Amino acid sequence: MSITAVIPARYASSRFPGKPLARILGKTMIQRVYERTAQAACIDRVVVATDDSRIADVVSGFGGEVQMTRADHATGTDRLAEVTARIDTQLIVNVQGDEPLIDPHMIEAAVAPLSEDPAIPMGTLKTPLLNWQEYRDPNVVKVVTDRRGFALYFSRAPIPHPRELAVDDSAVSPASMGLFRHIGLYVYRKDFLLTFAGLPESPLERLEKLEQLRALENGYAIRVVETDRVSLGVDTPEDLVRVEAHLRGL
């Protein structure tokens, strides 16, 4: 089975312009994401998708593969779909371009169900919530799954709600109650991704600003794999300090 990882990378960012080209201990962030992604045993090919020539030049400079996209895409999924249409592959892994510490084992875990079951169109990851602050944080997306590991819902709201317990009870952790956060790494079958990108924005997607709800609202299953590995994403220049500290400690 052919599996391609695509890393969408934009130069423009309201909080951190030029983020993919930020340097982390001598390497650009996009190079670190690319190299970590390539370490996943299941990945045959890694492609950076960008609309910016500066990013393209850097990727080509370190020997990576890059494909240019249109600049008018509304979402990262649309950019991903444009590149996917040109690639001869069966599975597409969407790796975020601001995850310089992405664990290759996370990619392998997300890919496994789709490799084993051709009926699954889409997959992603979840990890236990660490504390009640995360549970209440709307920037931390929560996910609820059924007994087979398929998503029932994703939300920025604190779900599910433990009715019999105050959510600030320090004696009980959210992890001990089976509460999970979503990790934004996705795996798609190529044909499904192209179909998905062509669907109109759904009501719940519009409300929560979560693209994966478009799949659920249209009746598509999303397999969610649990992992205890968590990456450190970079949203602001201050986050670079945490990433560098982690790398120095390795």
Swiss-Prot record:
Top-level taxon of the source organism: Bacteria
Q: Where in the cell is it found?
A: Cytoplasm
Q: Which InterPro entries does the protein's record reference?
A: Cytidylyl_trans, KdsB, Nucleotide-diphossugar_trans
**Disulfide connectivity?**
none
Q: Which GO terms describe its biological process?
A: CMP-keto-3-deoxy-D-manno-octulosonic acid biosynthetic process; lipopolysaccharide biosynthetic process
Q: Its Gene Ontology molecular function terms? A: 3-deoxy-manno-octulosonate cytidylyltransferase activity
Q: Which SUPFAM superfamilies match?
A: Nucleotide-diphospho-sugar transferases (SSF53448)
For this record, the Gene Ontology CC terms, alphabetical, are: cytosol
Question: What reaction does this catalyse?
Answer: 3-deoxy-alpha-D-manno-oct-2-ulosonate + CTP = CMP-3-deoxy-beta-D-manno-octulosonate + diphosphate
Name the keywords, alphabetized: Cytoplasm, Lipopolysaccharide biosynthesis, Nucleotidyltransferase, Transferase
As for what it does, the entry says: Activates KDO (a required 8-carbon sugar) for incorporation into bacterial lipopolysaccharide in Gram-negative bacteria.
Its family remark reads:
Belongs to the KdsB family.
Name of the molecule in the record: 3-deoxy-manno-octulosonate cytidylyltransferase
Q: Which organism is it from?
A: Syntrophotalea carbinolica (strain DSM 2380 / NBRC 103641 / GraBd1) (Pelobacter carbinolicus)
What is the phylogenetic placement of the source species in the record? Bacteria, Pseudomonadati, Thermodesulfobacteriota, Desulfuromonadia, Desulfuromonadales
